[in-house]
């Protein structure tokens, strides 16, 4: 045991302890009871919701209504896979959210260390903890429409930052678009679209720090925008069709 402790760094022990603490909070909260942060059927029967949400028109007791939830389909496919593994709705919810919070903290860690050369791994770890353990995340993160985009925001900004470092690359703009796609288009992607505004302060700060040319910035923004638009067509087209 002592040899093992000697081989494991204090950073690894701290990180492992924090992950364990997060797991206790997520999995131990309301143990044995199912809670949801969106329509219950999303966790109860996600596979049946996929077909329903792929249509621009949804049935209801009042002759139906326009469907603006096509953007939720990627999430439904993931949840269907978890349910297919035999997880109950309660554990599907908890496993999904545990993964979300790990992704969020890891992304915040990576983003801070990439944006600030002097940031140590401990600074990155603190950034990840603070990104999760703050009043806004605790309160607003109770709804999936906010929690999912928020978890992926650091990764989207990290891809943007890397794209600015390598203006000729298409890989990082593609990663930017994929991060936006993974946020899903639920609620007509209102939250992810607002989060795109975060790119403005990032480029204003980094342009001066890295002496970037506006032409290079414009090229990266255009490529990121093209991928975002292209990967959003699956919910944009049905949403426009639902309007009329």
Regions found by a protein language model. Name each.
Residues 48-61, 65, 217-220, 224-244:
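Periplasmic/ER-lumenal interhelical loops and adjacent helix-loop junctions
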Residues 1-28, 219-220:
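Start-transfer (signal-anchor) and selected internal transmembrane alpha helices
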Residues 7-12, 90, 94-97, 117-121, ...:
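Membrane-water interface of alpha-helical transmembrane segments
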Residues 85-88, 166-167, 210:
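Short coil/turn helix-boundary motifs
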Residues 20-105, 129-151:
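Membrane-interface coil-to-helix junctions
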Residues 3, 69-72, 76, 120, ...:
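Coil-to-alpha-helix initiation sites in intrinsically disordered, low-complexity, charged segments
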Residues 3-10, 64-65, 106-111:
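Short alpha-helical segments and helix-capping/turn motifs at coil-helix boundaries
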Residues 102-115, 120-208, 220-240:
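Membrane-embedded helix bundles of polyisoprenyl
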